[in-house]
């Protein structure tokens, strides 16, 4: 009996030993394909979507392997992940693994330092070489790059903003930044720091010297969508709606001579102090009259929005200005009355201007107005504006001599007589903004205006002929007017205005 028990015990141990050896000697993993897997055998997905690329597989034991793939993730041409394997009842193997990548993606426009990218893979592989592979990639590395044109969808205050450039960068997953180029009013470049990348997108907020910026966004199909909500710093309370000044008439004392029916106030503010008392009083009154009759026909109000936009209620109807009114001013007949103006103002048809065509920002105690020239041209010309984009860019970024030549070619006129100083002034206004003064009165009126010296380049007669009758004809104002008249850009019925305009440069040096 004891002998039988001994045999039974030996048999059990032998079976157990055989079973253990059988498990240890399972070499089925060695039958798995090695190296590159044929494309027709790969079911490949990236973040849940089918994709293409090259897959390499190499099992190193029954429980482990390496999975490599090329040209799958933008900027990461070659990724290898160590995975754990588990054999299935049907002989196939399941595998999964995760790899943290601390290398920036290599793209055409960015190829440096180290953002964080997390890559996770899982799938199955059969001895016949059939592979199903799912890759998940998350982190700042997916966003790094330069976005513009068709790769950027940018909104500013819920309105599309085109023609801009955004650079997404990072040194690691906790230090992500976005560079905005000429997007925030008054700032050539703005860096958004502390960008939080999570849940398939990014978000954050940044304070600059001029504004507070909140933003959200995401990237899909190589296109970056960025939404900006901007609030301008406004310590002087300039952000509000302004209506036009009242048109009032009265008697002015022009160097001892009363001038009845003169415009005292209007929608155009003009205050010009020169030695000649006649011109010091007469010319501002003329400008107030012309502006006071024309502006109310096209403009109802202007709003400086909290986000830096400038919007307006305007009319696109025709403008009426009778030549006889100008003659009346010249020969002392007085200005048209309030009743005449009221009949000129449209009673309906007022429109709200589009957003992102003009901006304001405070700087050095001045209110700067900056035009978005590409957007204005696009709004005016629609799809035809695209063909002008290179020319507009060359003008905005060119020097005075180049710009003069380009504009002359476009308008088919000779601009060579106009000074470089005038074009430098205009380019500075377009590229950097127009520096305006703001003055509030105790009666609640606001005057927004330019200093007289701002017009020096275009008003000063640089030739100063010895013949006093020709004073002013050497100014760029007179030359520009004559060029545009000769080219019929200015209509003939406005020709008489030069009689008024010439008085400005004639008296400017004083």
Mark where each language-model region is.
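Bacterial Sec-dependent N-terminal signal peptides
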Residues: 2-6, 10, 14-42, 122, ...
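N-terminal glycine/threonine-rich, aromatic-flanked beta-hairpin/loop signature
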Residues: 51-82, 152-193, 257-368, 374-379
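Short, solvent-exposed coil/turn segments at beta-strand boundaries
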Residues: 58-66, 89-90, 120-131, 169-177, ...
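Short, surface-exposed loop motifs enriched in S/T, G, D/E and P with embedded aromatic residues
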Residues: 81-88, 123, 190-200, 217, ...
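Surface-exposed or flexible loop/turn and strand-edge residues in extracellular/cell-surface modules
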Residues: 34, 39, 52, 64, ...
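Mixed-charge, low-complexity intrinsically disordered segments
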Residues: 253-294, 298, 318-349, 368-437, ...
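Short, hydrophobic/aromatic-rich segments at coil-to-beta transitions
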Residues: 31-40, 62-68, 89-100, 143-149, ...
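Post-signal peptide N-terminal segment of secreted/secretory-pathway proteins
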Residues: 66-127, 167, 179-218
């Amino acid at each position: 009996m004891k002998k039988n028990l001994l045999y039974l015990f030996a048999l059990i141990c032998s079976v157990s030993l055989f079973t253990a050896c059988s498990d240890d000697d399972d070499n089925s993993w060695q039958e798995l394909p090695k190296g590159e897997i044929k494309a027709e055998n790969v079911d490949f997905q990236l973040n849940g979507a089918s994709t293409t690329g090259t897959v390499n597989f190499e099992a190193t034991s029954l429980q482990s392997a390496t999975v490599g793939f090329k040209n799958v993730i933008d900027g990461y041409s070659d990724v290898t992940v160590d995975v754990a394997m588990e054999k299935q009842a049907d002989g196939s193997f399941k595998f999964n693994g995760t790899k943290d990548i601390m290398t920036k993606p290599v793209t055409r426009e960015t190829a440096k330092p180290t953002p964080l990218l997390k890559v996770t893979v899982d799938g199955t592989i059969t001895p016949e070489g059939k592979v199903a592979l799912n890759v998940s990639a998350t982190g700042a590395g997916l966003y790094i790059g330069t976005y513009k044109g068709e790769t950027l969808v940018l909104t500013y205050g819920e309105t599309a903003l085109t023609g801009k450039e955004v650079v997404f960068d990072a040194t690691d997953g906790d230090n992500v930044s976005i560079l905005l180029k000429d997007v925030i009013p008054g700032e050539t470049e703005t860096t958004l720091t502390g960008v939080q990348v999570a849940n398939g997108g990014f978000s954050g907020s940044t304070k600059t010297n001029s504004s507070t910026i909140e933003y959200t966004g995401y990237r899909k199909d190589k296109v970056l969508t960025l939404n900006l909500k901007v609030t301008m710093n406004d310590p002087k309370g300039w952000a509000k709606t302004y209506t036009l000044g009242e048109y009032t008439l009265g008697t002015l004392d022009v160097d001892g001579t009363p001038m009845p029916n003169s415009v005292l106030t209007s929608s155009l503010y003009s205050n010009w102090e020169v030695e000649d008392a006649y011109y010091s009083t007469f010319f501002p009154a003329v400008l107030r009259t012309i502006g006071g009759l024309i502006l109310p026909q096209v403009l109802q109000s202007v709003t400086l929005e909290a986000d830096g936009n400038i919007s307006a209620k305007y009319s696109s109807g025709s403008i009426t200005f009778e030549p006889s009114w100008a003659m009346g001013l010249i020969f002392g007949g007085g200005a048209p009355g309030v009743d005449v103006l009221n009949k000129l103002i449209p009673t309906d048809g007022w429109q709200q201007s589009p957003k992102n065509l003009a901006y304001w920002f405070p700087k050095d105690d001045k209110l700067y107005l900056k035009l978005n020239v590409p957007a204005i041209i696009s709004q005016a010309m629609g799809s035809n504006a695209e063909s002008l984009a290179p020319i507009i860019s060359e003008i905005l970024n060119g020097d005075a001599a180049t710009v003069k030549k380009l504009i002359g070619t476009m308008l088919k006129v000779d601009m060579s007589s106009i000074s470089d100083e005038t074009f430098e002034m205009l380019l500075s206004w377009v590229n950097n903004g127009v520096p305006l003064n703001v003055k509030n009165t105790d009666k609640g009126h606001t005057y927004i205006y330019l200093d007289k010296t701002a017009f020096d380049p275009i008003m000063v007669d640089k030739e100063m002929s010895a013949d006093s009758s020709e004073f002013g004809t050497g100014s760029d104002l007179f030359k520009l007017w004559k060029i545009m008249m000769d080219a019929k850009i200015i209509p003939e019925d406005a020709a008489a205005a030069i009689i008024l305009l010439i008085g400005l440069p004639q008296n400017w040096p004083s």
